[in-house]
Amino acid sequence: MPTINQLIKSERTVQKNQTKSPALDSCPQRRGVCTRVYTTTPKKPNSALRKVAKVRLSNGFEVISYIPGIGHNLQEHSVVLIRGGRVKDLPGVRYHIVRGVLDLQGVNGRLRARSKYGTKRPKK
């Protein structure tokens, strides 16, 4: 606890809360180009091959982002849209790629939660 003299000398500084997705620059989404598409393994209790992509954003940042859903058509130089949102068991992955926008197609045969995976309504 500071003394009164210490407070007179320099007043209290308000701590700014840091953003969890700095590469978005306060935007809801950002466009980028895939520089590498690969799989990686999650942290200790889990086991899988998670699909991720390294993306160079339009503002110059290079980030690792997660490709949600089953199957994808991404390759190097694909143009994608990035949103915030981390993957808890993949360290360093703080962004998601939006399905069904730009070069990334929606998930085929998806019937539930279609809007999250960019899938059109099936014909009856």
UniProtKB/Swiss-Prot annotation:
GO cellular component: small ribosomal subunit
Sites bearing 3-methylthioaspartic acid, chain numbering: D89
Matches recorded under InterPro entries: NA-bd_OB-fold (IPR012340), Ribosomal_uS12 (IPR006032), Ribosomal_uS12_bac (IPR005679)
Coiled coil regions, renumbered to chain: none
Keyword RNA-binding listed: yes
Keywords: Methylation, Ribonucleoprotein, Ribosomal protein, RNA-binding, rRNA-binding, tRNA-binding
GO molecular function: rRNA binding; structural constituent of ribosome; tRNA binding
GO biological process, one term: translation
Disordered: annotated segments: 9-28
Domain of life per record: Bacteria
HAMAP family assigned to the protein according to its UniProt record, in alphabetical order: Ribosomal_uS12_B
Function: With S4 and S5 plays an important role in translational accuracy.
Quaternary state and interactors: Part of the 30S ribosomal subunit. Contacts proteins S8 and S17. May interact with IF1 in the 30S initiation complex.
Family label: Belongs to the universal ribosomal protein uS12 family.
Protein name as catalogued: Small ribosomal subunit protein uS12
Source lineage: Bacteria, Pseudomonadati, Bdellovibrionota, Bdellovibrionia, Bdellovibrionales
